[in-house]
Amino acid sequence: IKKIWYGDVITSAVTKTSLKTWLGTATEVENSHQNTWLYTEDDPTYTDYINELNGDIYYRDVTQKGAKTITFTMGVFSFDDKVDLQGGEKVDTDAGWAASDTPGIVNKAIVGQTKTGNYIVFTNAAVIAKGNAVEKNIGLGVTAVAMENPSAGVKSDYMFDGEKVDAA
């Protein structure tokens, strides 16, 4: 991974120009701990229909899309990052962090730029962040799952050619 950003949920269809603008307003993750970045797309759930006469599959019905997930651990982070991604609140301005009284999911847009330059965009990700032991430290582990976007015409996720976004 080259770069990671997070910010407010994206509420309009993403184009190369709007993505470049959004990146300028988003928070850039300054540190992703070694070997913690991962993008996965689960296989969809499906039902196979079998022809009794010969035992072959004659139709496959996709019943549920597979989840798309980005995970990484911030090895260095601020209390602002922790509040933004995990919830809770800062204590004594910037002296510490206090957990939320109720568990919950934080919704954010998450964008990753791959080493080849392409952008993976989750417009409305359900983010769960937690303390994550890495080496001799506690990092901020982030799991973001692409969710349906509540805004009409906005897809849950996009992928863009990095050169075209950067040139916009």
What are these regions (language model features)?
Residues 96-131:
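Acidic-leaning, charged glycine-interspersed low-complexity segments
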Residues 15-23, 91-100:
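Low-complexity, polar-biased intrinsically disordered regions enriched in Pro/Ser/Thr/Gly
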Residues 1-82, 123-137:
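Solvent-exposed edge beta-strands and adjacent loop segments
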Residues 24, 88, 116-117, 162:
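Intrinsic-disorder/low-complexity loop/linker signature
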Residues 51-52, 114, 149:
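Acidic surface patches and DE-rich sequence motifs
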Residues 75-99:
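Charged, amphipathic alpha-helical segments
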Residues 69-73, 109-111, 141-145:
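Beta-strand secondary-structure signal
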Residues 117-168:
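Mixed-charge, glycine-accented linear interaction segment located at domain edges/termini
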